[in-house]
A protein has these predicted regions:
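A conserved beta-strand-loop-helix scaffold within acyl/acetyltransferase catalytic domains
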Residues: 3-85, 128-295, 399
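Acyl-donor binding region in acyl/amide transferases
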Residues: 73-159, 280-336
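Active-site/acyl-donor-binding loops of N-acyltransferases
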Residues: 140-177, 318-366, 370-371, 403
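Short helix-capping and inter-helix turn/linker motifs at the boundaries of alpha-helical repeat units
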Residues: 238-239, 298, 358-359
Length: 404
């Protein structure tokens, strides 16, 4: 098994046809592992990233049979820098994983694990992993207790008790009425009544984002979302809004976003962002925002019902509510899938190989310089020396290192 490292956008662009072929064949594949979504996301993130590509042959023109996209972070702990490997889709993707042609797992996953163990990292964060259990077991088997600590991360919210490792989804039949018949009689009647409000010309209407309205509609969505979540998330909200705006804008340009807005006359009431996977025929509900001061028909139920009806009419077979087992999702005829967050750490908390990853030298230099400027000289010196352990002649580290 040959493993290549792809770490530039031009090289990633050249993978499109091969990637799509593996994606279409892989039953575990989902939108956040698609070439189209990742090509936008990788161009957005600031930390170093790479994709491991596996070939079953040493021939240069042999096709890849599997891909593992990852990103590298730099952390400071106990006056030393270490690296952490994250799935490339973090922290925007609700699902991550390994893309693999069926039948190749038993060769590919061990080869990926061996490659990872030759890298420099202290923690491997397998966050939001949506993979079959055999694939997960095969991967984790290569990080035994003798050399690594493995822990499962619980994702149940302390405030709302929502389990963010549970992901409800509705399997969609080919006919809208057949879908309604899957629901309780009360829900069925409620949805029909609410959709009549927007189907019949009147005070309520739904618009769907176009190139001319996407900025306005995203502003509506994110403004409502910010108002709701600022009390709980604090200043983090601003970072999340910037990231979500960039990701959703790129997704819209790539024809991956369905964004309906509910209006009462000229007043926007709510907007709902859903990602579209045309290859796997799935709608993935990503986020919503609504006017919390509106006291009337439930905007969320209206927009979800409208979106599900639209999905069925266009031949989609799944409506995925993504992470979180919020009670309202269960009125839409859903099943559940469980994702996992497994953390693999080195025993001593230091990078494998004792050195930082070369790709993170710019990050370590930047952070060490900031520490230096703040008067935290011991930590800064450690950072400069860690850079020189990898690049002994690094001019920036040599210049900034205090004289002995």
């Amino acid at each position: 098994m040959r493993i290549d490292v792809i770490d530039t956008l031009p090289d990633f662009a050249r993978l499109e046809e091969n990637w799509n072929a593996v994606y279409d064949a892989d039953p575990d594949a989902q939108l956040f592992m698609s070439w189209k979504w990742l090509s936008g996301w990788l161009g957005q993130i600031s930390s170093p990233w790479f994709v491991l590509g596996a070939k079953a042959s040493e021939k240069a023109d042999a096709p890849y049979v599997a891909f593992l996209p990852m990103r590298i972070q730099t952390k400071l702990e106990n006056a030393r820098f270490h690296n952490e490997l994250n799935m490339a889709g973090n922290f925007s993707a609700d699902y991550t994983g390994v893309l693999c042609a069926p039948g190749a797992e038993h060769q590919v996953i061990p080869a990926f694990a061996r490659h990872l163990k030759r890298m420099n990292w202290a923690r491997l964060n397998l966050e939001n992993i949506r993979m079959s259990e055999p694939r997960i077991r095969l991967l984790l088997a290569h990080f035994p207790k003798a050399g690594f600590q493995t822990s499962e991360i619980n994702r149940i919210g302390k405030v709302d008790n929502i389990d963010n490792n549970l992901c409800p989804f509705a399997a969609l039949p080919p006919d809208w009425n057949a879908y309604l018949n899957m629901l309780s009689s009360n829900t069925r009647q409620k949805i029909r009544r609410l959709l009549r409000l927007v189907d019949e010309t009147g005070e309520y209407r739904i618009t769907v984002a176009t190139p001319e309205t996407i900025e306005r509609d995203l502003n509506t969505l994110l403004r409502f979302w910010e108002i709701k979540w600022t009390p709980r998330k604090g200043d983090l909200v601003h970072t999340l809004i910037r990231s979500n705006r960039a990701m959703l804008t790129r997704s819209f340009r790539a024809d991956l976003l369905f964004l309906p807005t509910l209006w009462k006359e000229d007043r926007p009431l709510a907007a709902l962002a859903t990602l579209i996977d045309r290859r796997k025929h799935a709608f993935l509900f990503y986020m919503t925002g609504r006017d919390e001061t509106f006291d009337g028909p439930p905007p969320g139920v209206i927009l979800h019902s409208h979106s599900i009806r639209h999905a069925i009419a266009n031949g989609f077979t799944e409506y995925d509510f993504l992470r979180g087992n919020e009670p309202y999702k269960y009125s839409f005829g859903v099943k559940e899938r469980r994702i996992r967050y497994v953390m693999v750490s080195t025993k001593n908390g230091l990078n494998l190989g004792g050195k930082i990853d070369q790709r993170t030298i710019p990050d370590v230099l930047t952070e060490s310089t900031e520490l230096h400027q703040k008067g935290r000289l011991v930590e800064a010196e450690h950072g400069y020396r860690q850079v020189m352990d990898v690049e002994p002649k690094n001019a920036d580290a040599i210049h900034r290192l205090p004289p002995v």
